[in-house]
Amino acid sequence: MGKKLVMAQKRGETRALCLGVAMVMCAVIAYYILGTTMLPLYQKSVWTQKSTCHLIETNIREQEELEGKKVPQYPCLWVNVSAVGRWAVLYHTEDTRDQNHQCSYIPGSLENYQVARADVEKVKAKFHEQQIFYCFSTTRENETTVLYRRLYGPQTLLFSLFWPTFLLTGGLLIIAMVKINQSLSILAAQR
């Protein structure tokens, strides 16, 4: 009976060690993926200064000629604000600025024009309700763009690192508990 118990303990310890090592390896892989995708975006984000923006004007632009380019077939919202003592164009996120420099807000669903138009109207109405709001600006002097919301801020980075850290801690805890259990069983066998 005693030998079967020892063998069962050994098998359980091996499985627990494998689980702990697998958790640590998954955490390392997740850290690598986050380090190569999220971290460069966070470091590249220059909109770090939280400012107060005052709404100047909002326009909904349909298909019209802007700087020699045709705006795509969706309505886009153009928002001008006053931030940090200067005039600026407000963009919803970093990605909005990269997708189309002529739109402050691009609606989520572009398939149905009427739904997109209603979405843009709703956002425009919210800006007119609350004409003073927080935005993110850069410390550069000649920059004339500000962001309403940062995609790659410190909170996003911390939230992304939470689960890999949880996985790493859990894996290390399992490995430590197995090793402590093994050393205690060796001490008990010696007595």
UniProtKB/Swiss-Prot annotation:
Residues 1-15, 179-191 are cytoplasmic. It is found in: Membrane. It is a multi-pass membrane protein. Residues 37-157 are extracellular. GO terms for biological process: detection of calcium ion. GO terms for molecular function: calcium-activated potassium channel activity; potassium channel regulator activity. Pfam families: CaKB. Its main location: membrane. Keywords: Glycoprotein, Ion channel, Ion transport, Membrane, Transmembrane, Transmembrane helix, Transport. GO terms for cellular component: voltage-gated potassium channel complex. Glycans are attached at residues 80, 142. Belongs to the KCNMB (TC 8.A.14.1) family. KCNMB1 subfamily. PANTHER family: CALCIUM-ACTIVATED POTASSIUM CHANNEL SUBUNIT BETA (PTHR10258), CALCIUM-ACTIVATED POTASSIUM CHANNEL SUBUNIT BETA-1 (PTHR10258:SF1). Regulatory subunit of the calcium activated potassium KCNMA1 (maxiK) channel. Modulates the calcium sensitivity and gating kinetics of KCNMA1, thereby contributing to KCNMA1 channel diversity. Increases the apparent Ca(2+)/voltage sensitivity of the KCNMA1 channel. It also modifies KCNMA1 channel kinetics and alters its pharmacological properties. It slows down the activation and the deactivation kinetics of the channel. Acts as a negative regulator of smooth muscle contraction by enhancing the calcium sensitivity to KCNMA1. This is Calcium-activated potassium channel subunit beta-1. It comes from Canis lupus familiaris (Dog).
